Amino acid sequence: MAGLSRILLSCTLACLLAGQAAQASVDDPTRAGGDNRVRALRADQARRDVLLTACRDDPGHRRGEPDCVNAERAQALQQWQAAAMTSVDAAFSDLAGALRNAAPRRMEAAIVRLTRQLQPLVYSMMTLLVLLTGYALLARRDRPFEWHIRHALLVAVVTSLALSPDHYLSTVVAGVQDVAGWLSGPWTAPDGAAGRGGLAQLDQFAAQAQAWVAQLAGQAANDANPGSAVNWLLCAMIVATSAGGWLCLAASLLIVPGLIVTLLLSLGPLFLVLLLFPALQRWTNAWLGALVRALVFMALGTPAVGLLSDVLAGALPAGLPQRFATDPLRSTMLAATLCATATLMLLTLVPLASSVNAGLRRRLWPNAAHPGLAQAHRQAAARQYAPRPAAAAAAAGPHQAGTYAASATPAPAPARPAPSFPAHAYRQYALGGARRPPPRVRRDDRPAPAPDRRVLPRKPNLP
C-alpha cells in the first residue's frame, strides 16, 4: 500500500501542475487576440481556404503575413483535433467493447477448446474408475455406505462428461454466466429506488470518460499556443489514465473470477477422480480451495464494483465536461481523485476476500491442509535443534537414552548453529545452498537398567 500511496501522491502533484498551467493559459489575456483570430479562421472554412490558396500562390511575399500564419495554424489545429478525437474515440470504444463482450467470450471459447482436448484423458479416467469400482465390489470388502455413494457419484459425473462433453461444458458456461449476470444485475436500494448493475455502470462511466478526454483534447486543439496545448494534453492524459485504470480493474473483477470458475468447473471431474487415490487427494483439496477462492472473489467483487460505480457516478458533477473549459485545475483534480479513490477501495477488497477464503477453508475443511515440504522441514529443524529438557536429563541419570553404557559425558553439540528463522533450513536446502537436514535418530525410550548390586561369594584361593 505504500507504493500505491506514492503513485497517488505523484498523480496528485501532476494534476496540480498541469491544471495550474492550463488555468494560466485560460486566464492569460495576452494571447486572446491571436487565439480568437485562429478560432475564427477555423470556423470560417471558406475564408481559410482562400487565404491558404493565396499564400501558396505567392509564397515569397505573403508567407510571413499574420493572416497566412493564422490560416496555417487553424488548419493544422483542426487536423490535429480530428486525429485526437478519432484516436480517443477508437481507444475508448475498443476498450469498452473488449471488456464488455469480446474478451469474456473469447476466453470462454478458449476454455471450451482446452477442455475438449482433454476428452481422451477423461475416457481413460472413466475406464480406470469403473475398473477400480468393480474390483472393490468383487473383492467383497466391508466398505462404509458413504464410500459407495461417493463412487456412484464419481462414476455418474465422469461418465456423463465422457459421453457428452459439449452438453456438460455448455451447462457449466451457461450456469456461470447466469450467476455472474445475477450478481452484476440491477439491485434495489433501501428506499426502493432501482440502481443499475455493474456492467451498465461501467458502460456509462466509459462514455463519460470518453467525453472528458475528448473535451480536454478539444481544448488542446483550440489553444493556439503550443505550450498551453501540451498542458491541456497532460490533463487529458491524467484523466484518461485514472479513468482507464478504474475501468480495467473493475472489469477484471467482473470478468476474471467468472472465467476462473468456468475453467475449474470444466476440469472438475478430473480432480474428483483423484479422490480415489489417497496420495493425490491434496490435488483435489487444492482444486476445491481455488474454486472457493474464485467464488468468494465473484461474490464480493461484483457487488462491490456495482456499488462503487454508483457512488462514483453520484459523486461526479453533471456538467463536468463543460467545467474543463473554464476551470481545468479543479475539474482534473476532481475526476482523477475520485477515480483513484475508487481504484484503491477496490484494491482493499483483495485482503478482505483472502481473509474470508481462509475462514471458509478452516470451517469447511479443517483437516484439508496438508503439511507441505516447508512445514515438514520446519518441524524437523525444530526437533533437531531443540534443547534437551533439564528434567529429562536428570531423570535419565548418567545413562543416555537408548544405550546401556554408563557415561556421564554430555551429548555432543550439533555441528551447525540453530537457524535464525524456522524456514531458513528448508530455504537453504531448496535453493541448493546446504545439505538436507539429517533425519532424527530414533532413541529407545525405555529406562536405563538398574545396576547389578548383588554380592557374589568370593572364590577360595586354592594353592
Curated annotation (Swiss-Prot):
GO terms for biological process: protein secretion by the type IV secretion system. It is a multi-pass membrane protein. Residues 441-455 have a biased composition (Basic and acidic residues). It is found in: Cell membrane. Keywords: Cell membrane, Membrane, Signal, Transmembrane, Transmembrane helix. One of its GO terms (cellular component) is plasma membrane. Residues 1-24 form the signal peptide. Residues 376-410 have a biased composition (Low complexity). This is Type IV secretion system protein PtlD homolog.
